[in-house]
Every structure is written in structure tokens, then in C-alpha cells.
Amino acid sequence: MANLRGHGTLELDVRDRASSWLLRFAPWTNKAWTTINGVIYPPLALSAEQVAAHGSRYDSTLAHEAVHVRQQARLSWPLFLLLYVLLPIPFLAPARAWFEAEAYAHEAEHYGRSADACVDAICSRLYVYPAPRWLVWWMMARFMQ
């Protein structure tokens, strides 16, 4: 049970990456937090037990991932996955940038992360450079109103 700013009290399902058959086929995600079908998987170097034991240390990240849980519930996780992962081919990923802008805007609003840091993160290799900075700024502004 986590009490996350902007979400209230939530029952989050956090599991080790090894429990996901899908993540076994996506080793490039091992260093990132990943949310699939309402389940949050911490990076490979961190266990679900460690996340539970250190609770508030991960609140802003869990709040960010909780936004993705809501997005997947709203769209269905197969559609979310299609938009987030597959439709960027051959280049750019405006849907990925949109999903991340909403989640990072939540972090900025409720946890004090700067908008600059959020845009830098979204426009980085972590997200495979999904969109031009000006577009990500526009998306962030839409969510931060």
C-alpha cells in the first residue's frame, strides 16, 4: 500500500522482473522501471522486496509508474504497448513522449521535479529520443496546466 501525492492511497502491484515472461524478451529494459498490465517491475538491480522495504524512497517513481497504470487501464495495455513500443518504427515516438510527459508532469507537480529535468529525461536515450524537445515542452505544458 502506498500513499502517493496526487494519487491518494493506492494498492500497487510491484513484482520482480523475473516473474514477467514478456520482460525476458526485452533485456534492453533491465535498467528501467517498467509497467505492464497494471504490474510495476523495478530495474533488474532492485527487487520488489527492496522497494517495499524502502517505501518512501521510491514514491516519486512509483507515482510516475502509477500514471502508466492508469494510462494502460484507460487504453488497454495491448493498445498502450502498441503505441509505446511498436508504432515508433521507423523513427520518433510521439505517443511514447505523450505518455511520459503525462507521467513526468505528475512528478513535477507533486514531487518538485523541475520541468527542465523532465524534458531532459524524456528527450534522452533512455526513451530512444522519442520527439523533438519543443514538442515535449508543449506536451509537458498541456499536462502541467
What are these regions (language model features)?
Residues 40, 47-48, 67, 76, ...:
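Short, solvent-exposed loop/turn segments at secondary-structure junctions
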Residues 41, 69-71, 89:
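Short, surface-exposed, polar/charged, turn-prone segments marking secondary-structure boundaries
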Residues 65-83:
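Catalytic Zn2+-binding segment of zinc metalloproteases
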Residues 13-18, 57-64:
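Short, mixed-charge, low-aromatic patches
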